[in-house]
């Protein structure tokens, strides 16, 4: 029988848009490759290769059928395997609109634990692939599964990509119920305070899950009722199934505005045998439309959005974001903000490294670097998936993510070493394909393992340290390397001796090194280095400086003192910022900045929440996704005193504190920095008492913060948070702690009439202000129960060694940064230091005679004009030579309009000075993901409830002339260009 499947929309009828899709996690219960090929099906029956093979065959059987697909990590794998004939068929399906790409990034990224640069990078990777292969531009965001939605997603990874709409399933259960009653599930979302309506997007929150209505899931092995319309067979049920369809459609129609509603026809890894779905949908379309009471059609998110837009309906306005997300009274998805804190650190560190890899590769010239950054791009793209960086995959899958990142990092390291060898060499670029110098780098600095700096030097050679600065402004920072000798001389490239400070290696680091080098390198390391050697490096913007370390003649003296202080108070800090600690307990008592006069009484401690295992009223446990502390008692204080050791020196003062056998920290105050750097070491978290533990650090001040604090959105905008409050609905407070946690990628701050207190983080984590004047960060978690959201494992990370599998819980080491300012005075520190944390200086090492090196190498150089640096309000967030020879450039303004009187203004970047050593021929401005001309981007107009159009006009930079190449950037603006040299 030939079915009529060609219906379009009908103006006067209820239109049910069937959107066939398969939700394909880029790793979760299985690894990305296991999901692709369909191995390990005892874990989960899932094979994405089958989905794509099967869908393509089904689509060609009927030109009216449609299907949407999002994850380019999978599609790219599939595409590389296809014959020319299959590629031609797929290209026809895409051109005809039957196969539509949604999102189009490498994965469906998480929105809580991702950094905006990573979100842009993987989306660009996918979008440029689609443009090259199909000349197609995705129009719809499809974030159906992430656990809450960010403001940056709404405006930056939405409107600025050229998306008309974004579609998702997960919003807070209280929010959803209110919106159902008001028909406000679908909204116009203005995620940016800065850009308002100029960066708005239509946001469609589904009435429930991202699957079809009950009874309409047609996966081949599901127990569904087929539509039976062959009169020669028993049990025909056309009328019954049409009525079922009608009932479900009319029920959903009560929740939406206009006569259009969407059915998401698919679920996790479905369409393994696509014909099972399409046969049933063909029959439904035919018989429902023949019945005539509603109209049903094959559709896609972009067609659905066009229909909504054409209806001339007025829509509710949504601002800010959709965090935190809860799907039940005791089920706040705020644990994953911190889950697998070490994996989140690796992703953050390699994100900054990937940025520097592409910079240095460009400046050295692609031919000279044997460019291999794709493996790291692929691994980082996969790592942004909403079960990867979020820490919610099974352990074996998490191991696979880590392996991919390590392999990608290894390839990128070769690019950086080769680039630096070429850049520092005095050979011409074309001679540099085989650079003479071989550099090595160190990945395990944080546990003091760096073989190049620990090995003894031959008599006539120095340790050559090349320090590369990936930022667009000059930096003066302390370089810290492990050494075995406190009798070293450090010289700069002019031969000047630098001041060196030595700090004795602490036992905590030595023990970590002994265990983790063995675990990571599968071989025992030599005994820990005896000291940290510290000196100040001065490095030009996007340039490098060279330092030479040699052994001094004669006996050396250590110019750092370890003190036991007399009196009640320990005062430390060689610069403007001072901290006072109790001599008796080691507790922090106050922070004081002698330059600004800000004085803040403040305490800091470590505590842990007991993970709930569920109770008689609700069996919900705390786990990888959810944070549910056990009952309402306050968290357990780890210790009210610490074993404290103070080291003072000309460059840095350090306070080493041990709170118990598994928590310690070092507080560092540098002479030239306005902040305290706190390095924490937590683990193994003990569980022999049968209790899961979620460890926080808490800073308690006297500030009157009125329930308010501010957290970043994906490292970009800061959003105001109010404890126990939601903008969009009257909140019933069921979890006073977990329900007030928010995701951090940059940091958070609080303020009152006297001062502003800021905390920055080095990785994605969760943070809160549970009482006025308090700030807490969750730093590490270890739970003993699964939380029932599908992963099927407790969050119990362990490190195992040797054949006997000696295992212990994972130890996490990381940094956070504290600073105090006058009211409204902290933004400059937050923005600048945030960039320095994201893009640390890169160190590369080799051994050579100092004079020989200086005669054959450039020891200090600039990629840009030596008298120029980027404005302090601008970051270079992408500089990459593409395969077609064009160069991708992205510049980001770092400030919101009212953040800083001087820097929150229109600013200019002179590209001729940025690229002083190369001749820039022309540039084209493109969309954020570089897949379309900026001038050709079209925006849908939406009517918004209560919109009086009184919002301030967003400031954006003007056109760039191909004569002077000056780029203007307004506050929070990101501009993307393709350059031709």
Curated annotation (Swiss-Prot):
Binding site for Zn(2+): 23, 25, 145, 386
Activity modulation comment: Inhibited by 2,3,4,6-tetra-O-acetyl-5-fluoro-beta-L-gulopyranosyl fluoride which acts as a slow substrate, doubling as a competitive inhibitor as it forms a high steady state concentration of glycosyl-enzyme intermediate that blocks the active site. Inhibited by 2,3,4,6-tetra-O-acetyl-5-fluoro-alpha-D-mannopyranosyl fluoride which also acts as a slow substrate but no intermediates accumulate. Inhibited by EDTA. Inhibited by metal ion Cu(2+). Inhibited by metal ions Fe(2+), Cd(2+) and Co(2+). Inhibited by metal ions Ag(+) and Hg(2+).
Location of the region described as Disordered in the Swiss-Prot/TrEMBL record: 938-957
The protein's required cofactors: Zn(2+)
Role: Liberates mannose from p-nitrophenyl-alpha-D-mannoside. Liberates mannose from further alpha-D-mannosides including methyl-, benzyl-alpha-D-mannoside, 1-6-linked di-, tri- and tetrasaccharides of alpha-D-mannose and mannosyl-rhamnose. Liberates mannose from various glycoproteins like ovalbumin and ovomucoid. Does not hydrolyze beta-D-mannosides. Has glycosyltransferase activity, forming disaccharides from mannose and lyxose but not from glucose, galactose, ribose, xylose or arabinose.
Enzyme class: hydrolase
Catalysed reaction equations from the record: Hydrolysis of terminal, non-reducing alpha-D-mannose residues in alpha-D-mannosides
pH-activity note: Optimum pH is 4-5. Activity is stable between pH 4.0 and pH 7.0 in the presence of Zn(2+). Activity is stable between pH 6.0 and pH 8.5, decreases below pH 5.5 at 25 degrees Celsius. Activity is lost at pH 3 and lower, rapidly diminishes at pH 7-10 but is higher and longest at pH 11-12.
Subunit structure, as described in the record: Dimer of dimers of heavy and light subunits.
Keywords assigned: Disulfide bond, Glycoprotein, Glycosidase, Hydrolase, Metal-binding, Vacuole, Zinc
Disulfide bonding pattern of the chain: 422-432, 442-450, 800-807
Protein's name according to its UniProt entry: Alpha-mannosidase
Active site: 145
PTM comment text: Produced as a precursor which is then proteolytically cleaved into a 66kD heavy subunit and a 44kD light subunit. Cleavage probably occurs in protein bodies/protein storage vacuoles.
One Gene Ontology MF term: metal ion binding
Principal cellular location given in the protein's record: other
CDD domains to which the protein is assigned, alphabetical: GH38N_AMII_LAM_like
Lineage, highest ranks first: Eukaryota, Viridiplantae, Streptophyta, Embryophyta, Tracheophyta
GO cellular component: protein storage vacuole
Biological source species: Canavalia ensiformis
Temperature dependence per UniProt: Retains 50% activity after 5 min at 70 degrees Celsius. Retains full activity after 5 min at 70 degrees Celsius but is completely inactive after 5 min at 80 degrees Celsius. Retains 100%, 50% and <10% activity after 2 hours at 40, 55 and 70 degrees Celsius, respectively.
Coiled coil ranges: none
Similarity field: Belongs to the glycosyl hydrolase 38 family.
Compartment(s): Protein storage vacuole
């Amino acid at each position: 029988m030939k079915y009529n499947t060609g219906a379009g929309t009908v103006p006067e009828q209820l239109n049910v848009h069937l959107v066939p899709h398969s939700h394909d996690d880029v790793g979760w219960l299985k690894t990305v490759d296991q999901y692709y090929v369909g191995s390990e099906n005892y874990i989960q029956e899932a094979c994405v290769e089958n989905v794509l093979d099967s869908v393509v065959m089904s689509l060609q059987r009927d030109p009216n059928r449609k299907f949407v697909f999002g994850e380019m990590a999978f599609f790219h794998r599939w595409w590389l395997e296809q014959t020319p004939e299959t590629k031609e068929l797929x290209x026809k399906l895409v051109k005809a609109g039957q196969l539509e790409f949604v999102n189009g990034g490498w994965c469906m990224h998480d929105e809580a634990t991702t950094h905006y640069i990573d979100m842009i990078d993987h989306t660009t990777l996918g979008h440029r692939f689609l443009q090259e292969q199909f000349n197609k531009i995705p129009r719809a965001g499809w974030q159906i599964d992430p656990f809450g939605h960010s403001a940056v997603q709404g405006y930056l990874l939405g409107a600025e990509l050229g998306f008309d709409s974004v579609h998702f399933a997960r919003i807070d259960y209280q929010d959803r119920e209110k919106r159902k009653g008001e028909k406000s599930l679908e909204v116009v979302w203005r995620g940016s305070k800065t850009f308002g309506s100029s960066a708005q997007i239509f946001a469609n929150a589904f009435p429930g899950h991202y699957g079809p209505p009950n009874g309409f899931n047609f996966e081949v092995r599901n127990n569904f009722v087929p539509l039976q319309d062959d009169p020669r067979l028993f049990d025909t049920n056309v009328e019954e199934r049409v009525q079922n369809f009608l009932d479900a459609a009319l029920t959903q129609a009560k929740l939406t505005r206009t006569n259009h509603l969407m059915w998401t026809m698919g679920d996790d890894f479905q369409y393994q045998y696509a014909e099972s779905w399409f046969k049933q949908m063909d029959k439904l379309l035919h018989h429902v439309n023949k019945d005539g009471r509603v109209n049903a059609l094959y559709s896609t998110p972009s067609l659905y959005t066009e229909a909504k837009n054409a209806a001339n309906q007025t829509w509710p306005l949504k601002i800010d974001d959709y965090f935190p997300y809860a799907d039940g009274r005791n089920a706040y998805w705020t644990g994953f903000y911190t889950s697998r804190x070490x994996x989140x650190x690796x992703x953050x560190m390699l994100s900054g490294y990937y940025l520097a890899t592409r910079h240095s590769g460009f400046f050295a010239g692609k031919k000279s670097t044997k460019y291999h950054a794709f493996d790291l791009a692929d691994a980082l793209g996969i790592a942004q998936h909403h079960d990867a960086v979020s820490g919610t995959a099974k352990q074996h899958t998490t191991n696979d993510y880590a392996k991919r990142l390590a392999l990608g990092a290894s390839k990128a390291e070769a690019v950086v070493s080769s680039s630096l060898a070429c850049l520092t060499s005095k050979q011409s670029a074309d001679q540099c394909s085989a650079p003479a110098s071989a550099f090595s780098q160190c990945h395990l600095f944080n546990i003091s393992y760096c073989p190049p700096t620990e090995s003894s030097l031959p008599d006539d050679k120095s340790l050559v340290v090349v320090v590369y600065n990936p930022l667009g402004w000059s930096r003066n920072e302390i370089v810290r390397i492990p050494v075995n000798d406190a009798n070293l001389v450090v010289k700069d490239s002019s031969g000047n001796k630098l001041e060196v400070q030595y700090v004795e290696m602490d036992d905590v680091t030595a023990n970590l090194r002994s265990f983790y080098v063995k675990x990571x390198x599968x071989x025992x390391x030599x005994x820990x280095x005896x000291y940290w050697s510290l000196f100040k490096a001065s490095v030009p913007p996007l340039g490098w400086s060279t330092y030479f370390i040699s052994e001094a003649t004669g006996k050396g003296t250590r110019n750092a003192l370890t003190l036991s202080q007399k009196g009640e108070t320990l005062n430390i800090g060689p610069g403007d910022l001072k901290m006072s600690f109790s001599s008796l307990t080691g507790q922090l008592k106050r922070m004081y900045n002698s330059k600004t006069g800000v004085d803040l009484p403040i305490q800091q401690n470590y505590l842990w929440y007991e993970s709930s295992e569920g109770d008689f009223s609700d069996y919900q446990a705390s786990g990888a996704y959810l944070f549910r502390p056990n009952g309402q008692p306050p968290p357990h204080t780890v210790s009210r005193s610490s074993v404290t050791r103070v080291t003072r020196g000309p460059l840095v003062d350090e306070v080493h504190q041990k709170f118990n056998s598994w928590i310690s920290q070092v507080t560092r105050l540098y002479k030239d920095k306005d902040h305290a750097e706190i390095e924490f070491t937590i683990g193994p978290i003990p569980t022999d008492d049968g209790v899961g533990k979620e460890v926080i650090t808490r800073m308690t001040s006297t500030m009157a913060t009125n329930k308010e604090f501010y957290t970043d959105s994906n490292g970009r905008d800061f959003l105001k948070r109010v404890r126990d409050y939601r903008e969009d609905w009257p909140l019933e407070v069921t979890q006073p702690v977990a329900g007030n946690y928010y995701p951090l990628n940059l940091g958070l701050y609080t303020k009152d009439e006297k001062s502003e207190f800021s905390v920055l983080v080095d990785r994605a984590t969760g943070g809160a202000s549970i009482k006025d004047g308090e700030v807490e960060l969750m730093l590490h978690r270890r739970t003993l129960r699964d939380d029932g959201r599908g992963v099927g494992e407790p969050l119990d990370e362990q490190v195992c060694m040797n054949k006997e599998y000696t295992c212990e819980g994972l130890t996490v080491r990381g940094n956070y940064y504290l600073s105090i300012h006058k009211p409204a005075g902290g933004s400059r520190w937050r923005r600048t230091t945030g960039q320095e944390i994201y893009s640390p200086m890169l160190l590369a090492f080799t051994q050579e005679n100092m004079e020989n090196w200086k005669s054959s190498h450039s020891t200090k150089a600039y990629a840009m004009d030596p008298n120029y640096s980027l404005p302090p309000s601008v970051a270079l967030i992408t500089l990459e030579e593409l395969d077609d020879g064009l160069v991708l450039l992205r510049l980001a303004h770092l400030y919101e309009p009212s953040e800083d009187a001087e820097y929150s203004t229109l600013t200019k970047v002179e590209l001729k000075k940025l690229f002083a050593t190369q001749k820039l021929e022309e540039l084209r401005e493109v969309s954020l993901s570089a897949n379309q001309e900026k001038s050709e981007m079209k925006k849908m107009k939406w009517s918004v409830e209560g919109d009086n159009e009184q919002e301030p006009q967003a400031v954006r930079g003007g056109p760039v002339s191909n004569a002077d190449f000056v780029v203007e950037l307004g506050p929070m603006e990101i501009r993307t260009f393709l350059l031709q040299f």
